[in-house]
């Protein structure tokens, strides 16, 4: 299945200046779901953000709440499909200050900037696993990085003197 995503994304990619959505260039919902599935499983094994994390909230989530992982994979897939220009609408399960609700969804996990960066590295490896072309990979990673402040807001709020 790995090369299929890269082949689909390459086949659907347009020349620079095209108005083809990132969703289409990634290969659509099935290709996005494959990457999200791989990515979600890989986070659990990550030493910084996964089941052995120094962060007790992340460690607890990745060891005691894995029954929620299928739903989280669905929500992540829906979120990526929606924000990449696909024909889907994402509604956060915990609405927050932003329309995506990322700060509310992640606040109790107190994700640090280092942990966020570790998850970004996991995402990079998942995109590489599926041979996502460089341009699309950079768009996905930039979109992910754009939400760092929202995702790490709970950690920042818990810091002394904040």
Per-region residue spans from a language model:
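Core of compact, soluble alpha-helical bundle domains
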Residues: 2-162
């Amino acid at each position: 299945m790995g090369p299929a995503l890269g082949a689909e994304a390459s086949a659907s990619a347009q020349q620079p200046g095209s108005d083809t959505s990132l969703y289409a260039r990634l290969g659509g919902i099935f290709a996005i779901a494959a990457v999200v599935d791989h990515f979600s499983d890989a986070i659990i094994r990550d030493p910084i953000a996964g089941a052995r994390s120094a962060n007790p909230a992340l460690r607890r989530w990745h060891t005691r709440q894995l029954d929620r992982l299928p739903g989280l994979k669905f929500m992540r897939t829906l979120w990526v499909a929606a924000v990449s220009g696909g024909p889907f609408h994402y509604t956060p399960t915990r609405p927050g200050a932003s329309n995506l609700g990322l700060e509310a969804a992640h606040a109790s996990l107190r994700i640090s900037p280092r942990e966020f960066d570790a998850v970004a590295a996991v995402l990079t490896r998942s995109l590489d696993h599926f041979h996502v072309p460089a341009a699309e990979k950079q768009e996905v990673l930039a979109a992910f990085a754009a939400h760092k402040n929202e995702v790490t807001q709970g950690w920042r709020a818990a810091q002394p003197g904040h």
